[in-house]
Design a protein with these regions (language model features):
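Glycine-rich beta-alpha junction loops
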Residues: 43, 121-123, 190-195, 227-229, ...
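A glycine-rich dinucleotide-binding beta-alpha-beta segment and adjacent secondary-structure elements
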Residues: 291-344
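Short Gly/Pro-enriched turn/cap motifs at secondary-structure boundaries
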Residues: 209-215, 221-222, 324-327, 346-349
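Aromatic-enriched alpha-helical interface/lid elements that frame and gate functional surfaces
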Residues: 219-292, 296
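A short glycine-threonine-serine/GTX helix/turn-capping micro-motif
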Residues: 151-161, 185, 214-220, 231-232, ...
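Short linear loop/turn motifs
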Residues: 256-270, 300-307, 324, 366-384
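Substrate-binding/catalytic subdomain of NAD(P)-dependent oxidoreductase enzymes
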Residues: 173-210
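N-terminal helix-loop segment corresponding to the beta1-alpha1 unit
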Residues: 1-182, 205-206, 320, 349, ...
Length: 384
């Protein structure tokens, strides 16, 4: 159920999107109060259930309905359930749901106010639309890995930004529908989202402007301390931060250099900074550099963040009681009037809410019993 006192209270989202971007979108919407119903396949559910850490991180707070869309009665039940929604979100290959009778044009006939959001790799049209890909390929094609020494990134940026823009599409559509009474069709391509967030790199190139030098300052980098702890300096271009750093590191000859002059001498200055920082432990630099108001910080581990007082004060980690014991999650990042809206329930078991929600949607008891039977007859299994 939705949370009436939260920003998205009263909005129901039915999701047919699996794995990463769709579930990340509905996680954000759910934390902000939307009632999220996840449609899963009865055998195995969302494939990400095979990866417990991933599934738990993305799927708390939702209700699970297991339906085999190849079964005519299950397909009809799915359409009925979608009829109770404000937003439907899907992540199938382009055209698949249309062939099943669950495309935007078909569902809009039932409910003209329905907001329909499709998230896919390359969008619903274009020469790449049917290309299979995961996050690394999206980043490569979008130019994000165009560096002297390309490396596999640690974060799935296409999945993350795809999810965020999918949530943005859902909220945009719901807001528009409330004012106009009509929904709409929102086509989110993960590839497009990466081009959008790479605008500061791509727009200068498109307009034959000089490339920016942000990140080339010798005061922008990672440095090892005497005790092996790594720390970061992020002086992007500011001369006053550089002057403060030179005072803290006893580098008077470099104190008055401009950003352009520093970049010209980047290698030598970077080496000088590294040499000085390596001479003292991290605790020393916490006091000296952070104390001087220089953009500085340690490289935190997951354990560091779990114990961080700032993170605790902002209530970013929230623990809730579940049938499987207490579980800890990271909330969506917005504080709304000082309230840290977060998860209201844990991760659902596969099909846990099928009977409840189909019955509430008015589906005949005999049909509900038949659709639930495969779940009740199977061997009980853990969430994942």
């Amino acid at each position: 159920m939705s949370s009436p006192n939260a920003p998205l209270g009263g909005i129901r989202v039915v999701s047919l999107a699996e794995q990463f971007p769709g579930p990340f979108a509905t996680l954000l919407l759910g934390d902000l109060g939307a009632d999220v119903i996840q449609i899963e396949r009865p055998r195995g559910g969302d494939p990400s259930r095979a990866f417990p850490g991933l599934y738990q991180a993305l799927n708390r707070g939702k209700r699970s309905v297991a339906l085999d869309l190849k079964d005519p009665e299950a397909l009809a039940a799915c359409r009925t359930l979608i009829g109770t929604a404000d937003v439907v979100l899907e992540g199938f290959r382009p055209g698949v749901l249309g062939r099943l009778g669950l495309g935007h044009d078909q569902l809009a006939q039932d409910n003209p106010a329905l907001v329909y959001v499709s998230v896919s790799g390359f969008g619903q049209h274009g020469p790449l639309r049917d290309l299979p890909a995961h996050d690394l390929t999206f980043q490569a094609l979008a130019g994000l890995l165009d560096t002297a020494e390309p490396r596999i990134p640690h974060l799935a940026l296409a999945d993350l930004f795809g999810g965020m823009f999918t949530a943005f599409a859902a909220v945009t559509g719901a807001l528009a529908a409330r004012s106009s009474g009509r929904g709409g069709y929102y086509d989110v391509a993960m590839f497009d989202t990466l081009l959008t967030v790479a605008a500061t790199k791509l727009v200068p190139h498109a307009n034959a402007l000089p490339a920016d030098t942000l990140g080339l300052d010798p005061g922008y980098g990672l440095f090892a301390t005497a005790d092996g702890t790594w720390v970061s300096l992020s002086i992007a271009f500011e001369d006053h931060f550089w002057a403060a750093l030179c005072t803290a590191l006893d580098m008077p000859d470099a104190h008055d250099l401009t950003s352009a002059q520093r970049i010209d001498r980047r290698e030598a200055l970077h080496a000088a900074i590294a040499e000085r920082i390596s001479a003292q432990p991290a605790d020393h630099w916490d006091a000296v550099l952070a104390g001087a108001g220089i953009p500085y910080g340690r490289l935190n581990t997951a354990e560091d963040l779990l114990a961080d007082p700032h993170v605790a004060l902002r209530q970013m980690f929230q623990s809730i009681a579940t049938p499987d014991g207490e579980q800890t999650f990271i909330r969506q990042p917005l504080l709304v009037d000082g309230v840290a809206h977060g998860p209201r329930r844990g991760v659902p078991r596969l099909g846990e809410h099928t009977a409840e929600l189909l019955t509430a949607a008015g589906i005949a008891p005999a049909v509900v019993d038949r659709l639930v039977a495969p779940l009740s007859e199977s061997t009980p299994s853990p969430i994942y």
